[in-house]
């Protein structure tokens, strides 16, 4: 709403879901269609996009897995130095047989648009409720003095808990009163299930060189798993803070 209220009312503001591997988008904007807040406008031309549940059943107006059911013009034939297409198969075809699984947690809408809730392999599970990280970030990053945040699951006592890491503005302390503000905002805007077990302040949040938060790397760090490739991370030095502070919960 900010852009339309403060900058310009008749601008096309939209997002996408796609990727480098397909040199394209599965869902994207269209200047001939209306724009609805929080939604990507439509499927891309030539893309047989759908939302599947975990059993491979197509669902509507419910959260699930973004897939492409048919071949498309820019579908990669193979990855470089990937003998027998092992990496390609593991990346996109392991979950559903012969159907491209894009690993976006998404929902189709009554407007024929799409909502992306985050990467499906980084979604959180709280008491059996699946939570997309993007919906949590939208609430937390709208709180005054929060610059950005990231949430991941940590294994704990044969279960998992949600850790929320927040980067705050300079000279702002994450004290008990601020933690309560964050939890209350999450509860009122989302649900009690969305409230993390721990809220932890960090100096910086690790990102790729293209600016994407590396949720899966952070998840591995807090679960004491081996990280094999740090070359794509622009600020790997901040990972150690995540490792140290996350161990407080164990």
Would you name each region that the model predicts?
Residues 199-209:
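Short proline/glycine- and acidic-rich turn/helix-capping motifs at secondary-structure junctions
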Residues 16, 52, 152-154, 202:
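Conserved beta-strand termini and adjacent loop/short-helix elements that scaffold enzyme active sites
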Residues 13, 49, 149-151, 198-199:
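Generic structural signal for residues in well-ordered beta-strands
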Residues 11-12, 162, 195-198:
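Residue-level recognition of the N-termini of beta-strands and the immediately preceding loop/turn
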Residues 1-113, 120-123, 136, 142:
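Conserved AMP-binding/adenylate-forming
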Residues 72, 77, 98, 103-194, ...:
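AMP-binding/adenylate-forming catalytic core of the ANL superfamily
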Residues 43-46, 242-250:
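Acidic, glycine/GT-rich loop-and beta-edge segments that sit at the periphery of enzyme/chaperone cores
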Residues 220-226:
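Short arginine-rich
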């Amino acid at each position: 709403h900010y852009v339309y209220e403060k900058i310009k009312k008749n601008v096309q503001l939209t997002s996408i879901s796609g990727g480098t591997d397909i040199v394209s988008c599965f869902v994207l904007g269209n200047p001939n269609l209306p724009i609805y807040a929080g939604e990507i406008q439509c499927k891309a031309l030539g893309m047989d996009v759908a939302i599947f549940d975990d059993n491979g059943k197509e669902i509507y107006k419910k959260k699930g897995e973004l897939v492409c059911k048919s071949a498309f013009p820019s579908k990669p034939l193979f990855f470089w130095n990937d003998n027998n297409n092992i990496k390609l198969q593991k990346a996109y075809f392991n979950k559903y047989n012969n159907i491209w699984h894009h690993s976006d947690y998404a929902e189709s809408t009554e407007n024929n648009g799409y909502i992306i809730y985050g990467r499906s392999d980084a979604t959180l599970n709280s008491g059996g409720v699946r939570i997309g990280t993007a919906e949590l970030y939208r609430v937390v990053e709208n709180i005054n003095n929060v610059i950005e945040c990231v949430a991941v699951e940590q294994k704990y006592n044969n279960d998992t808990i949600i850790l929320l890491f927040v980067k705050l503005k300079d000279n702002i302390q994450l004290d008990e009163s601020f933690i309560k503000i964050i939890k209350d905002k999450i509860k009122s805007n989302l649900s009690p299930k969305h409230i993390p077990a721990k809220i932890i302040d960090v100096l910086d949040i690790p990102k790729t060189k293209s600016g994407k938060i590396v949720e899966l790397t952070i998840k591995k760090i807090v679960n004491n798993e081996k990280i094999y490739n740090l070359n794509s991370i622009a600020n790997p030095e901040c990972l150690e803070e995540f490792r140290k502070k996350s161990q407080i919960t164990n």
